[in-house]
Amino acid sequence: MVKFKAIRGVAFDLDGTLVDSAPGLARAIDMALAHQGLPAAGEALVSTWIGNGADVLVERALHWAGREHNAQLVAQTRELFDHYYAKTVEQGSQLFPQVKATLAQLAANGLPIGLITNKPTPFVAPLLTSLGISDYFSVIIGGDDVVVKKPHPAPLYLLLGKLGLHAREMLFVGDSRNDIMAAQAAGCPCIGLTYGYNYGEAIATSHPDCVLAHFADLLPAIGLPSLKDQEV
């Protein structure tokens, strides 16, 4: 694609893009709610709250549970969430299909790979290690590494500086409107994935430069051989 001809690096969102993390997040939120005598929300609902970081996830859960939340209640629930999520983050997460093989091909072609996630930073490295993909990333930016998270472009600016790339040279791949808005604000070309967590909205409504249904389709989209072609 012409839009991607200048690409010299690729960066990814984490939850809903590389990793199906909804089961672990839902278990942690439900246990935090139960600890306070509140009902469980369940994975289907929690998956629509993912993408803006842990504080917003907690706020959405409390709002759903009918609790008028203040800073103290949010902080208390966030502490409970962190406690439980530390126990569920690894076993409650799995890679989406063909993620590892696709990352391997990007790395084999000499492209630096970055990660930008709103997930609290302490959870990121252990999760990547448990999934066997940590070594593919040149730079990892978690939710605590910047003052403002996606959809603000600040995390992308930080990554561009660390990789020494111009905005037009870095492709950003994500599954939610926050990812697309951040990329567009930073001036980076972007791809939206249809299978992730986007608040029940079609990713195409955010107008990414390209929409893909399968992670491995990224390779031919940027001019590299597909995984299927490499098997021949």
Swiss-Prot record:
Which GO terms are recorded in the biological process aspect for this UniProt protein? carbohydrate metabolic process; DNA repair; glycolate biosynthetic process
Reactions mediated catalytically = 2-phosphoglycolate + H2O = glycolate + phosphate
Give a GO molecular function annotation for the protein.
Answer: metal ion binding
| EC numbers on record | 3.1.3.18
Signal peptide positions are: none
Q: Does the keyword 4Fe-4S apply?
A: no
Q: What class of enzyme is it?
A: hydrolase
Annotated active site: D13
Q: Which UniProt keywords apply?
A: Carbohydrate metabolism, Chloride, Hydrolase, Magnesium, Metal-binding
Q: Which residues are noted in the entry as Mg(2+)-binding? A: D13, D15, D175
Where does the chain cross the membrane?
A: none
Function comment: Specifically catalyzes the dephosphorylation of 2-phosphoglycolate. Is involved in the dissimilation of the intracellular 2-phosphoglycolate formed during the DNA repair of 3'-phosphoglycolate ends, a major class of DNA lesions induced by oxidative stress.
Describe its assembly: Monomer.
NCBIfam families xrefs: HAD-SF-IA-v1, HAD-SF-IA-v3, PGP_bact, PRK13222.1-2, PRK13222.1-4
The UniProt similarity line reads: Belongs to the HAD-like hydrolase superfamily. CbbY/CbbZ/Gph/YieH family.
Q: What is this protein called?
A: Phosphoglycolate phosphatase
Native species: Yersinia pestis
Q: What is the lineage of its organism?
A: Bacteria, Pseudomonadati, Pseudomonadota, Gammaproteobacteria, Enterobacterales
Q: Which gene encodes it?
A: gph
